[in-house]
């Protein structure tokens, strides 16, 4: 939830063509909705891409946006990923200030979150963490007292639980 507004995760299967991302994102911006997270990547189907869009919006406007998305020629299919029926993950790279006295404590915290150290320097550690947005927020809260120098986060990616994929026939 974001400010009491429901958060929705949409998986959108699209043709892998120039301009599709701009057309899809403009549908949200024209209606004044901020996309909280956006991830786009290849799929198991040649010439198709998958967009995972996270947006905070009430159900009724979301239904309108979904109808408009379905009218776009390059949009093949849209699925709302319900929290109970999907697996969602995000990736974060976090650079934390670390010296000889704090390095051990930071590594201990990183291990608790099943994250890993991917770069070490005399003054910092770079950590790779994957998980739900809530897990990553919790890790950031733990690391904050040490001094976070830099964060790079991917968008949320999500797939339905079970054997069927977004491209599966009905």
Curated annotation (Swiss-Prot):
Keywords: Amino-acid biosynthesis, Branched-chain amino acid biosynthesis, Isopeptide bond, Transferase, Ubl conjugation. Transmembrane segments: none annotated. It catalyses: 2 pyruvate + H(+) = (2S)-2-acetolactate + CO2. It holds the Pfam family ALS_ss_C. There is a cross-link at residue 46 (Isoglutamyl lysine isopeptide (Lys-Gln) (interchain with Q-Cter in protein Pup)). GO terms for cellular component: cytosol. GO terms for molecular function: acetolactate synthase activity; acetolactate synthase regulator activity. GO terms for biological process: isoleucine biosynthetic process; L-valine biosynthetic process. Its EC number is 2.2.1.6. Pathway: Amino-acid biosynthesis; L-isoleucine biosynthesis; L-isoleucine from 2-oxobutanoate: step 1/4; Amino-acid biosynthesis; L-valine biosynthesis; L-valine from pyruvate: step 1/4. Residues 9-83 form the ACT domain. It is an enzyme of class 2 (transferase). Dimer of large and small chains. PANTHER family: ACETOLACTATE SYNTHASE SMALL SUBUNIT (PTHR30239), ACETOLACTATE SYNTHASE SMALL SUBUNIT 1, CHLOROPLASTIC (PTHR30239:SF0). Belongs to the acetolactate synthase small subunit family. This is Acetolactate synthase small subunit. It comes from Mycolicibacterium smegmatis (strain ATCC 700084 / mc(2)155) (Mycobacterium smegmatis). The gene is ilvH.
């Amino acid at each position: 939830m974001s400010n009491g507004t429901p958060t929705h995760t949409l998986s959108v299967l699209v043709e892998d063509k120039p301009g599709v991302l701009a057309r899809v994102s403009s549908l949200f911006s024209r209606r004044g909705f901020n996309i909280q997270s956006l991830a786009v990547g290849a799929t198991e189907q040649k010439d198709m891409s998958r967009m995972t869009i996270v947006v905070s919006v009430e159900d009724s406007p979301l239904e309108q946006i979904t109808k408009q998305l379905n009218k776009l020629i390059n949009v093949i299919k849209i699925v709302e990923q319900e929290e109970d029926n999907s697996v969602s993950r995000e990736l974060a790279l976090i650079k934390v200030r670390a010296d000889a006295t704090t390095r051990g404590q930071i590594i201990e915290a990183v291990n608790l979150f099943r994250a890993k150290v991917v770069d070490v320097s005399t003054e910092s550690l770079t950590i790779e963490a994957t998980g739900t947005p809530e897990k990553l927020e919790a890790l950031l809260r733990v690391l904050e007292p040490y001094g976070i120098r830099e964060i790079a986060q991917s968008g949320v990616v999500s797939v339905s639980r079970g054997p069927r994929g977004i491209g599966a026939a009905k």
